[in-house]
Amino acid sequence: MSEFSYEMLNEFLIKSVIHEFYIPHKNDSKFKLFVKRDDLIHNEFSGNKLRKLKFNLKAYFDNRCYGILTFGGAFSNHLLATASVCNYLNIPCIGIVRGDELDLNSNSILRRCSELGMILSFYSRSNFNQIKKTTGNYFFEGNQYWAVPEGGANTEGVFGCREIVSKSDFDFIIVAQGTATTSSGILLELKEKQKMIVVPVLKGFDSLKEMKTLLGNEFERLKDKLIVLDQFHFGGYAKTNSELIFFVDKFNETNNFQIEPVYTGKVMFALNKWIESVNFKENKKVLFVHTGGLTNL
């Protein structure tokens, strides 16, 4: 396969639909809640993962690279998504994994990446941190690869995420923040009166700094559209407590889509609290972007 065609991926992207949902006692005359179902795109490269890879795949083809190389931790959904989509498109791929004490049998994610054909290379944390943001043409063991930074956090990833909310007419769009790639793409696409609510899932994550790094001068023009709810990380990445687990379980019992406690559960919890804290004179439409995160592995 020598050329990139958007049709290669569109059969998956069109599965993402928008529908209304409910939080008990929160859907009233002031709010209508909707969800963008990017979790339906694919069981392994679902959510924002394929969107962040879309234009990186185009760059791989345009630069006539040998393969794709990317970075991730031991439980990285980004590594899994990259391995899966490269398997689908028959593209050689390498995953640089944080932690030289690991191997491909350390967990089900890494094992599945290997099964899909991804060559895994395990680096010490210090060496990994030095190269995890590498992007663009990158020579590795004698071959030219297109390097995608950890989490897909590059310009190509941002542009792929712009498409999440194109042509939408919602007043507020709320999304999880891990690397700020998805939220940066959405911010670029907002219309004049739209605002975006971001919920960092990492403790101490500097949303404004990370988004400015990705967007450059464009960020200054758009930053007033941004609302940061940075108090709902529950202690940090993948950290939870009984209150969050109870909320997620109750939500999943009463809705026709699932959330989880690492990303989407924290966003939904934050949305619930935010609705309680605001008072608008006019009705508002809110879009919750479901970024996936459920791999069943």
Language-model features: locations:
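PLP-dependent amino-acid enzyme catalytic core
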Residues: 1-297
